[in-house]
Structures are given as structure tokens and as C-alpha cells.
Amino acid sequence: KAMAFDGLIPALQSGQIDLIASGMDATPERREHVNFTQTYFKDGYTIVVRKDNDTIHSFDDLKDITVGAQMGTKAADYAKQYGAVVKEFNQNDQCWMELESHTCDAVVVNRVVALYFLNQGGNKAFKTVGEPILSAGVSMATTKENSELTAKVDKALDELKADGTYATLYKKWFGTEPTD
């Protein structure tokens, strides 16, 4: 079921969905409200700019720069922490369109979202810059009461990692080997 990122935890808690599988960081704040599965990949946040950009090289360069980010994400929080003027959107696709149309100067996004977009035929006029900010690790989320589903997902993840399926899929979609 497609929905805005900032609506995922409320949708889970109200019973509209059973599981969040949406690149969510297992932060301490979120752990207060949901159960998380084991981390299924390590991620971080990166900056995407147009290839002709020669002024933004790191998060420190975002001060007073117009940055696109998905609403309700840690990416938006980090952009704000570095002093960016943040335009928040419901979907990352909107961020890419804003960057392409020059209505924002950069996009802050999950590293794997950027890798997927650029590796799978996204805009060839974009590039990533700087070192990513590492995240707490990406997990799926269930309600606090649904530890049975959490355990089933953990078991499935263990099996996918053990038989090599996880590594194969990760390389296919992100163009690189998974990190621990």
C-alpha cells in the first residue's frame, strides 16, 4: 500500500497495515512506538546534485542552500541540522524533479535510494557528493504487540542472507556489494 513516509507509523498503529518495509531507520525515537526487525542493510544519507554543480561538496556546504528531501525523514532532519532551506515532498520523485528544474540545489536522501536511482537509469545529469552520514540501520517495523510477525520476518531475512539471495539482489539493484 503506497502512502507518505510520515504516515507509516500512524498507519501501522491504527491497523491499516501490518508491516512497514520502507527504508526506515531503527532510531531510538521510533523504537518507542514500534518493534523493529533485525537490520537488513546499513545505509546513510547522501547529497545528490546536478553534475554541473561545483559548490556543494559536503553537508557543511548546505547552509542557506535550497535542498529537497522527503517529508518526515531523517534526511530532511539532517538537511535542516546543516542549515539548509528544506523543501519537503511526499515522494523522492518530486525531489528529483525539483533538482532537475533548478528549483532546489541539492537533494538529501538515503544513500541506497540515490544509488538505486542513479544505477537504474535515473537522471544522468546528477551525481552524489561528499561522505554519507551513516544511519542506525534500516529495518522493517511491526506493532509492539506483533512480536510473532517480527520473528517471522527475522527468520526470512536470516534465510535470504544465508543462501546468498540477499547479496545477489542487493548487487542487482544497488550496483555494489552489501555492507555489514
Q: Where in the sequence are the language-model features?
A:
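A ligand-binding cleft/hinge motif common to bilobed small-molecule-binding domains
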Residues: 23-32, 78, 96-100, 105-135
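Ligand-binding clefts/hinges and TM-proximal coupling segments of bilobed small-molecule sensing domains
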Residues: 74-87, 126-129, 152-180
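Flexible hinge/capping segments at coil-to-helix
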Residues: 50-66
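Extracytoplasmic small-molecule ligand-binding "clamshell" domains
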Residues: 1-23, 163
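Periplasmic-binding protein-like
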Residues: 42-49, 111, 115-158, 176-180
